[in-house]
Regions:
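An exposed, glycine/acidic-rich loop-and-rim segment of catalytic or binding clefts
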Residues: 2-319
């Protein structure tokens, strides 16, 4: 039994709006134990994720906002969102398929990032609440949107399972050859959104290699983690080496790197990483069928916005 509820889910009324000629809404999920979530079809994003801490107090570990307007106005449109058509940076905003070069919208210096100015995180998706534990969002990206070839159809299903999992399932297809890198961009603080600090969280990643980046955060080559600040093969605190005198730490202004997982490309979800909140005792295990996991430590948070709990989005408030 829960002893205390530190926070509540945001109000559905504060997520009602008309954007791009479509209605936005907030959807609640609850499993049969004590997990609760709130999600919106604006960006197919997670707004809240409430889980019990070591004292059985319900805690919101998903960093976000309490109104739809704050998401629309946010400098970073990715909080909790489904990001695409291609998450991450593409050098020069250019790529080639079958000797045809495509020019994307450039929106990060000289490069493209996170699908362009109108990436999936800025779109209103169609929504279908399947049951109390699942909701499906779907979107059709037209041929040429932000420079990407092909009509691209995507759906994501979020489920709170009775194994205390937030399960994310992505399905997509295109009628032309294209590129895609679809992610969920949740920001977490396992001590609770209001705690402000992630430096003492414990982290372990099942990876002995990572993608090195240049000063523009463009991946350049693979490097081994041994004897570097990127060795999380055993548990370390996030903040232990985050300011190390290391070229890769400096290029990312902290951690902003993809780790290549030891399991390769599994046919079923495999354990990629484990994070533990030092104060809450909340442990999060990340499972995936993908070959890598990206670790980012909120290095560009500037305190410009106010989260649901009333705290600012200060430097490294979440990961």
């Amino acid at each position: 039994m829960l002893k205390q509820i530190k926070t509540q889910l945001p109000s559905k009324e504060k997520f009602i709006a008309t954007i791009q000629g479509k209605e936005t809404a907030l959807y609640y999920l609850k499993n049969k134990i004590n997990l609760f979530a709130a999600l919106t079809n604006y960006g197919a994003r997670v707004v809240s994720l409430l889980v019990p801490d070591k004292n059985e107090s319900l805690t919101d570990i998903n960093v976000g906002f309490d109104t739809i307007e704050k998401y629309i106005d946010a400098e970073d449109q990715c909080y909790g969102a489904t990001v695409g058509r291609y998450a991450g940076r593409i050098a020069g905003g250019k790529f080639s398929i079958d000797d045809i070069e495509y020019q994307l919208t450039v929106n990060n210096g000289a490069n493209a990032i996170h699908g362009g100015n109108t990436g999936f995180q800025t779109r209103v998706w169609d929504a279908n609440q399947i049951n109390n534990q699942s909701v499906q969002f779907s979107y059709v990206s037209v041929d040429g949107e932000e420079g990407y070839p092909g009509k691209f159809t995507i759906k994501v299903i979020y489920t709170l399972t009775d194994n205390d999992e937030l399960k994310m399932e992505f399905e997509y297809s295109s009628d032309k050859k294209t590129i895609a890198n679809i992610i969920n961009h949740n920001f977490y603080n396992l001590n609770g959104e209001e705690s402000r600090d992630i430096n003492h969280h414990l982290l372990q990643i099942n990876s002995d290699r990572f993608n090195a980046i240049n000063k523009d955060c463009i991946p350049t080559h693979l490097e081994g983690v041994k004897n570097t600040p990127f060795d999380f093969t055993s548990f370390h605190t996030i903040g232990e080496r985050i300011n190390a005198n290391d070229v890769q730490i400096k290029n990312g202004a902290g951690y902003d790197h993809t780790f290549v997982l030891d399991n390769g490309v599994p046919t079923k979800p495999e354990l990629a990483a484990t994070v533990i909140g030092d104060l809450s005792g909340i442990a999060m295990e990340v499972y995936t069928t993908e070959p890598g996991v990206h670790f980012y430590t909120g290095n560009s948070m500037h305190g410009l916005h106010t989260f649901k709990s009333g705290v600012k989005d200060d430097y490294r408030t979440a990961f």
